[in-house]
Amino acid sequence: MSRKNFLHFPIITNGNMALSSITSSVTNIQRLDNIGIQFNWSGAPVGDFAVQISADYAQDTEGNVTNAGNWTPITLSPSPATSSGSPIYIDMFQLSAPWLRVVYTRTSGSGTLQATIVGKMI
C-alpha cells in the first residue's frame, strides 16, 4: 500500500485581531484531497474569515517566494464570521488549486487568533 500525504500545522499563531487584517502563511495543498482549517480565538473580535487560493503563487526549493501570485477567495456559504463563536472549523473537499492561505478582516473589537490547517489524501 502506498503512503498517503497528510499535513497538520499552525498557520496563524497569536495573531493580533486588533489589526485591520491578518494573513496566514501560505500552504502547499498539492496532492491533498481534503483540507480543514480550525480558528480559535480569545477576546471579543468582530470580523470575517476568508479562504484564498492561488494557481500562480510560487516558491523555490528553499521556501523563498519567487512569485507572489494572484489570490482568489473561495465562496463559503455561510461566510465564516467571529459572530459564530470560537472555534470555527472549515472543511473543504477536492480543491484544485495548489496554494492556500486564510485572511481575517477586522470590523471591530480585539482578540488573539490561532489557526491550524490539516489535510489528507484519500
Say what each PLM segment does.
Residues 4, 49, 103-121:
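Edge beta-strands of jelly-roll/beta-sandwich modules across compartments, strongly enriched
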Residues 32-39, 93-112:
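Noncatalytic modules at the cell exterior or secretory-pathway interfaces
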Residues 12-30, 43-49, 57-62, 67, ...:
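Surface-exposed ligand/attachment interfaces on beta-rich extracellular proteins
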Residues 74:
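Non-catalytic beta/alpha edge segments that cap or flank active sites
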Residues 53-59, 119-121:
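Residue-level signal for short segments within beta-strands and strand-turn junctions
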Residues 1-16, 118-122:
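Short, intrinsically disordered N-terminal pre-domain segments
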